[in-house]
Swiss-Prot record:
Record field: transmembrane: 64-84, 89-109, 130-150
Organism this protein belongs to: Parasynechococcus marenigrum (strain WH8102)
Enzyme Commission number(s) from the entry: 3.4.23.36
Enzyme class: hydrolase
Name of the protein in question: Lipoprotein signal peptidase
Catalytic function, reaction form: Release of signal peptides from bacterial membrane prolipoproteins. Hydrolyzes -Xaa-Yaa-Zaa-|-(S,diacylglyceryl)Cys-, in which Xaa is hydrophobic (preferably Leu), and Yaa (Ala or Ser) and Zaa (Gly or Ala) have small, neutral side chains
Length: 159
């Protein structure tokens, strides 16, 4: 079992880094933007604006904190079991799992600890829901899964 976990250390390290960046930036945003202030982070592109989201992505299922907290716990547990029980995954699949694990855990920590998710990244040029680093990681997971799917189909055709 120890060897299995050690082989997964890079995957778990990426997930841990996602959680660390997510929680640290949320803590900073909560302290610096609590008064309703909007701060330019990347002028003309991204502003910092604090929002407490009691829903999921795009504020879907608003007010369903307990249900979403249980869902986060179930997904996190399922991913951890998958990581430990399965062989070392191909690169893109491993990155997808790492980003999904880190993003799910990052937002899950907020739900369990605060009763809402801290969102604070607002895209300036378009009207888009405010988001956070965990959301970015979850979207990167989808992208990595698609790249893995594409690369495995390409290699099966040519190999």
């Amino acid at each position: 079992m120890t060897g299995s976990i050690l082989r997964r250390a890079p995957l778990l390290g990426v997930a841990g880094l996602v959680v660390l960046v997510d929680q640290a930036t949320k803590l900073l945003a909560a302290s610096q933007l609590a008064d309703g202030r909007i701060v330019q982070l990347l002028p003309g592109l991204i502003n910092g604006q604090l929002v407490h989201n009691t829903g999921a992505a795009f504020s879907l299922f608003r007010g369903s904190v307990q249900w979403l907290g249980l869902l986060s716990l179930a997904v996190t547990t399922g991913l951890l079991i998958w990581v430990v029980r399965h062989r070392t995954p191909p690169f893109w699949q491993g990155m997808a799992v790492a980003f999904l694990l880190g993003g799910t855990l990052g937002n899950g920590i907020d739900r369990w600890r605060l009763g809402h998710v801290i969102d604070f990244l607002a895209l300036v040029p378009i009207n888009f829901p405010i988001f956070n680093p965990a959301d970015i990681a979850i979207n990167l997971a989808v992208l990595c899964f698609l790249v893995d799917l594409w690369s495995s189909r390409t290699s099966s055709r040519h190999g």
